């Protein structure tokens, strides 16, 4: 993509309404535009990041055996009355009526609808276990939306729902999502720490929040520092095997949100030098809720002996749009964003330091074509902006690889390459740049 043809409305000044780093940088970098309190338009740069986050979530859900579907944003109020949650949910739920006076709601979550789908089609234990998920926009009418996408009213979520014949099966499903979440956040450059948490309006008796440590987080958390060094399960993990050792490894060390924190246990189990009390951002939460929805909604299947059995369920959420903000909170400096490669809007940016110069123009064009041919998602800054402005833009939007093409280095057959993550610079030939980013062999 040529920057001269890309829509990137960068702000020179810090927005006054932005209270935290991620909100400020997302607005400044032209990722978002606020349309109303807690409601944002995702502009091209931000939308590219959002789609890359979504794809990682999708790949890890599929790897764990979940099946994707898509449910509507609007739901019938009667479904929620069946579960007893319509009146209990509170003013955060947006309730509306259509022209026929039918009561609807803009779904803040989907336990009722997915249970309705399940009971309509699944009648036998032979169709279990089953895990269905979707990635869809949600709405919760927050009383005080703030912090940009971290606490908005409209947001993109991945919701998965598991159905099993008994509690043992449901806990196996829970463990699969536990492991999938560890891998999902790690691929985004984050350490999502599973912490015991309250179940809230979802209900049930077992839940973990996945927390990214950040001083700007809304959640107070307590944990053993050693949890930060635990290994992430590899891509080769066998989801059909016994995941209990992984779960025990991650849950044997103390980690809890402030809502369920046990001070006496914390002090008894964790040596003082390993006690960590800080704040964090919730990026996902998983629940085992047994028969909370299947019982009132009569989601039954025929068991092995032919008798009807009430299924056991769980739900598993990831804040897809919130993750964009969480990644920035964890990956930034004073100059701007430092995107991990897997979620960066572009993997590399070519900076033409003498726009209009025949040699630099030709070298940039060739490098641009060669990188595209290798499948590299590259941005070419072909604008008339001065070099200093191009450096500032590249740092602000956080592209992992900055390739600087100037007359002096080009005279030696080289370009300068800077990695945004650590600021390291090196001189490389254009061919070596293409080989490095395109997966080939670097000369020498």
Curated annotation (Swiss-Prot):
Say what the protein does. Catalyzes the attachment of proline to tRNA(Pro) in a two-step reaction: proline is first activated by ATP to form Pro-AMP and then transferred to the acceptor end of tRNA(Pro).
| EC main group | ligase
The entry lists its GO molecular-function terms as: ATP binding; proline-tRNA ligase activity
What's any one GO cellular component for it?
cytosol
Statement: the UniProt record of this protein carries the keyword Metal-binding: no
Name of this protein: Proline--tRNA ligase
For this chain, the family text in UniProt reads: Belongs to the class-II aminoacyl-tRNA synthetase family. ProS type 2 subfamily.
Q: Name the source organism.
A: Bradyrhizobium sp. (strain BTAi1 / ATCC BAA-1182)
- Catalytic activity as recorded in UniProt: tRNA(Pro) + L-proline + ATP = L-prolyl-tRNA(Pro) + AMP + diphosphate
Which E.C. number(s) belong to this protein?
Answer: 6.1.1.15
Q: Which Pfam families match?
A: HGTP_anticodon, tRNA-synt_2b
Cellular location(s):
Cytoplasm
Q: Which UniProt keywords apply?
A: Aminoacyl-tRNA synthetase, ATP-binding, Cytoplasm, Ligase, Nucleotide-binding, Protein biosynthesis
* GO biological processes: prolyl-tRNA aminoacylation
Tell me the subunit arrangement: Homodimer.
